[in-house]
Amino acid sequence: MVSIPATSLYGLGRQQPFQDLSKSLLTHLNLFTPQEAQSQAVPGTRTETEPTGSSPSDLQEQRKLADDKIIWAPLDYLCSFPGKDIRGKLISAFNQWLQIPEDKLDVIKRVVGLLHSASLLIDDIQDSSKLRRGFPVAHSIFGIAQTINSANFAYFWAQQELKKLGKPEAMVIFTEEMLRLHRGQGLDLYWRDSLTCPTEEEYLEMVANKTGGLFRLAIKLMQMESHNTEDCVPLVDLLGIIFQIRDDYQNLQSDLYAKNKGFGEDITEGKFSYPIIHSIRSDPSNFQLMNILKQKTEDEDVKRYAVRIIESTGSFDHCRKKLENLTAEAREILKDFGDLGNTDGLKGILDFLELKG
């Protein structure tokens, strides 16, 4: 008999790392119902009692289970200390008025949870990150090759989960948004690696594709299942941009962010984030910031000097003002949605995303 934890990624509190990772992926993503688990080798489960004798099919199943645990291990490790789960909260908030059936909602949450976690594994490799949520990145534990394979496996597992929605349109949405996400990521990487500073408009278009991709995927799948015909995509695109600009700001200004990811990680990565782009374009005659990005430095004194340059051009103030304007725009859209159902959850997310202080 297989022991299946009932909880999902959504609603879990922070767990201690270095727990028994053999349980974590199923616990967080709730990939199967108990009935399905009886007939499938589920990564991250264990038998409650060992049979006194094992048939060839039992042994084959046990071997497959052991293999799957190896394949899932990097993702298991990442999921053993969940983040803020903004995407899960966003899905729940939109469902207050989209009102899709619970079984469909669970599938969409699993799909987005898998895709998001897999994308973090890949991002950390592409960005040469050291920390994720305050702990060593997965590829520092399992190696780059195994981590890439685990992430790719999760992408296709998410695709397989879509079949449970029973609609061909779901696959069209999935493919379209994954292509947009990777287009956005490709431009972000190109700008960094070629030391090409984009315009703010180019950056925001990239963000709409990249950061907004999983937001949009989730909401489009929900709209597909909902009787509510209001188009939520413009609001979702706006939320994706707000989320990214806020993240860019926090990367260079937040002590908590520094604790979880390292101080000024975007500078070490050489990334053209929103405040960095504004600073460079505000003073094209000053090449210091561009040269610091080129070095991909880990020297904290140099990074703090870069932050002072960004501050001197008013770029952090510009970020705060941009976020205020975008948040006000999102609240105006919510007013139009108010007559269609409960929007308290979405208002709560906007409150959370507002910079404090």
Swiss-Prot record:
Enzyme Commission code: 2.5.1.-, 2.5.1.1, 2.5.1.29, 2.5.1.10
Binding annotation for dimethylallyl diphosphate: R132, K210, T211, Q244, N251, K261, K271
Where Mg(2+) 3 is bound, by residue? D247
Observed effect of gene inactivation: Accumulates dihydroxyfarnesyl-triacetate lactone, 17-methoxy-16-hydroxyfarnesyl-triacetate lactone and epoxyfarnesyl- triacetate lactone.
Q: How is the cofactor bound?
A: Binds 3 Mg(2+) ions per subunit.
Instruction: Provide the binding site for Mg(2+) 1.
Output: D123, D127
* SUPFAM superfamilies found in the cross-reference section: Terpenoid synthases (SSF48576)
**Keyword flag Metal-binding:** yes
Question: Which residue ranges does the record annotate as region Disordered?
Answer: 36-60
Pathway(s) the chain acts in: Secondary metabolite biosynthesis; terpenoid biosynthesis
Coiled-coil regions listed in the entry: none
Which PANTHER family does the UniProt entry name for this protein?
Answer: GERANYLGERANYL PYROPHOSPHATE SYNTHASE (PTHR12001), PYROPHOSPHATE SYNTHETASE ATMG, PUTATIVE (AFU_ORTHOLOGUE AFUA_8G02400)-RELATED (PTHR12001:SF70)
Protein name per its UniProtKB record: Geranylgeranyl pyrophosphate synthase spyE
**Species of origin:** Aspergillus fumigatus (strain ATCC MYA-4609 / CBS 101355 / FGSC A1100 / Af293) (Neosartorya fumigata)
